[in-house]
Structures are given as C-alpha cells and as structure tokens.
C-alpha cells in the first residue's frame, strides 16, 4: 500500500476521516524539521506579505512592523508610532494602492514560486487579509482602536468596508490562479482571559467581513481554516456557520472539551496545548513526552485533532530551549505515528 504524504494524511480530516497518524500543523518553519515536508504551507500576495518576508518595515498601509527578542522573531506594529489617531479621519490616512494594472496571472505565479510549497507533499493555504480587528489595532493601538469601536461605529463600518473591498478584490483575482487546498481566515480578537469584543460587537463588525471572504472558498468547495488566539470560543459557533472547518491554535484557555463534544470531526482542532508549561525548567524530557501523549489521548481518539506544538526560540543561544524543541519534535513524531496503530 502506498505511503500517504503529509498533505494526503492531513486533508483526510476535512472529509471527516481518521488520519493514519496525527498530523502536525505549523505556522512556519520548525527548527529541527527542515527536511520534513510540512502538512501545510501558505501563499499570500507579495504586496501584502513583503514586509514579513523582509523581516519588518512598513506594510502597504504605512504601519511599521518590528521584531524583538521578546517576540521570538514575530513581527508586531511599532507601539509608539501609530498612523491613525481619529477613526473619523481615516480617509485622510488610509490609502489602498491601485490594483488596476496588475497582471494577476503573472503575480500569482511569482507568489507560488516564492512560497516554495511542494504541492505534491504539502497542502497549500491561501490568505489575504490579516484580520480586520488586528488591522484597526495596528492603525490606532488598542486604547484608541477599542474606543473607536464603541464611540464611532459609522466610521468603523466605513473603514472596514473599504478594507474589505480591497482584500476581496485581491482574493477574487488570485484564488483561481492559486487553486489552494485550504483558505485561511486570520484575526486575533481575544486575549488569554477574555475576548477583546463582545459577541454582539463581533457579529456587528467582523462576522460579515469574514463571511464575505469565506464565500470565495465555499463557492469552490475549499476547506476553511480559522486562526484566532486566546479565549475566542464564544465566536466559534458563528464561524462554523459560515463554513469554518478547522480552528488553530485552539488554546487551552477555551473549553475544548465542550467544543469537541459539540462538533466532533466537523471542526478540526489544531493545537490544544500549553507551550508555556513545557518551558518549565523543572520538567524532564519524560514529563514533556507524557504531556504531549496526554493531549493526544484527550483530543485525537476520534480524529479531528492536529498537533500544533511549535516553540519560538527568542535566544538562539538558549541551549535549554533548543533541547526542549528537539524533545517536542521527537515526541510529536513518535506519538503521532503510533497513535492509531
């Protein structure tokens, strides 16, 4: 019998099938797994991702992204130089670049080459918008951005519609050239302890925007993956209704038992672990292995679960964390490949 690729094994779960082994979903390259084909890779338009590829700088809106040791290489908006201080004046500041003269076929070909995904082994996920909530916070910062949602709903709706028109034009012109296996919707609308917005505000502002994007995937039968960190379980029902098939990183601050009981294999959970826990210097290698085994036992017995256990190492010279990462990689492989035998 032919051996499944990582892609084939992962994509089985979108059909409600139990995979041959527990897949590993990653949000980027994983140290120690450079020679292993990832289950998923991402393609995004150059104009939207150029600042990330070059490790920082200004995005298309003028927001400057920087990295730091504390962010473990992640890019975040510069927190002392926001570009918008009054949402009612967004038209004076937020200027979408023209899309009129783009050769979409050629642009998509270049994007696919740049992402370096071997589609025979790895599922391709496409994405455009990096989240409407996140984008507003990047423009204004959390204090002014959250106040704007409460104080200036008309201006916020107008800004979001403007952004949505821009992003959906890009999706409309790229999706049939990319021909992705998966479609990503990304927005971090929650902190660890609570959502940043109420369910009512989520439905008023953000759900219609996600639904508009999701329709491109629904119309083509493309599975939809939803990324939202933090305690965002209150939004999951609505996201499933618009077609979401997978949620990452499904962090443990959520009631994951209740989510799995309700949706079973209909909603794949990718993650479900506590990366802070395994950085405890008192833990042995066996403790880490046992923790990951427990996650598999709790989440994977009926399928619908994917490991997303990746440690971002802020200090390349931190031998302890380098070792922990190696232990995690080995444990996930061994546990995952033996779980359904």
Task: Show which residues each predicted segment covers.
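A contiguous, low-structure linker/loop signature
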Residues: 54-102, 117-125
